[in-house]
Amino acid sequence: MLIDFIKMHGLGNDFVVFDARKGPSLALSGSQAAAIADRRTGVGCDQLIVLEPSTVADAFMRIYNPDGSESGACGNATRCVADLLHRDGIAAPCMETVAGLLLAEINGNGICIDMGQPGLGWRDVPLAREMDTLFLPLEAPGLKMPAACSMGNPHATFFVADLAELDIPVTGPLLERHPLFPERANIGHAQMLSRSHIRLRVWERGAGLTLACGTGACATLVNAVRRGLAEREAVVELDGGQLLIHWREQDGHVLMTGPAATVFHGRIALESITG
C-alpha cells in the first residue's frame, strides 16, 4: 500500500508530513516512525508528523522524533502544518497537539504561531525534584547552571560566552538524558549577541543537533528574559536561519514568527521500509 507524504522544512528543520485528516487513519508504531525518519534507509527527517481529524481544531498533530518517541510540541513543524492548512483554504489555522491548541496567523513577515504560555514551575518542565527552574544545579564542560521551562516539551538553556568553544555532540546526549529530566530534555546553548539578538544551537531530545528548533528558540527567549538578559522581543539566530520571538507581557503568550517551505510530495510503501 502506497501512502502519500509531504516533505517540508522550517529553517532546515525538516519533516515528513502524513495528512490523514480525510483519508484512512494512520497508526504508526515507534519503530515505523524511526524507520521512515532514517536518512539512509527511509525518507529522512528531524521529525515525522501525522495529521489527524480534530473536534476542536483544524487538525491534530501527532509528532514523532527520529528515535520513534513522541513529542508534545514542535514549533517549526507547527509553522509547516499551518502553511499546509492555509494553502488548503484555512485563513487562520488552529492546530491541536497533546500539549494544547496552537493558533497561527499568516502575514507578510511569515507564519506567526501563538505557542501559548511557557511552563515555569519544576513540575511543568518537568524536573525530577523541586527546585528553582531559573538556575539548575547542572554542569558539563563549558556549561553550568541552565534555566529550564516547558514550551509543551522540556527545555534547559545554557547561556555561554562563545558557542564555538562548546562540543555539543559530546555534551548534548549526556545532558538530554540527565536524571534531573525524567522525560529527557532539549538542551539549548545560547550566546547573547545583544538584548534583542540571540545566537542559539539546540541539541533536541530524540533528534540530536538540528539546524533549528522553534520551541527551543521560544524557551531561550523566555529564560533570557527571566534572567534579565533580553528584551521581551528578540531575533533568535539558529544554524538554519532566524526566528522572531515575542513573549507578550499582557497575557504571557509566546509568539514565534518564521518561514515554512514545501520541498516535495512523495509516496512511500510503508511495509518495504519497516519490514
Curated annotation (Swiss-Prot):
GO terms for biological process: lysine biosynthetic process via diaminopimelate. It catalyses: (2S,6S)-2,6-diaminopimelate = meso-2,6-diaminopimelate. Pfam families: DAP_epimerase (PF01678). Keywords: Amino-acid biosynthesis, Cytoplasm, Isomerase, Lysine biosynthesis. Its EC number is 5.1.1.7. The record marks H155, E204 as: Could be important to modulate the pK values of the two catalytic cysteine residues. Signal peptide: none annotated. It comes from the Bacteria. Substrate binds at N13, Q47, N65, G75, N76, N153, N186, E204, R205, G214, T215. Catalyzes the stereoinversion of LL-2,6-diaminopimelate (L,L-DAP) to meso-diaminopimelate (meso-DAP), a precursor of L-lysine and an essential component of the bacterial peptidoglycan. Homodimer. This is Diaminopimelate epimerase. The gene is dapF.
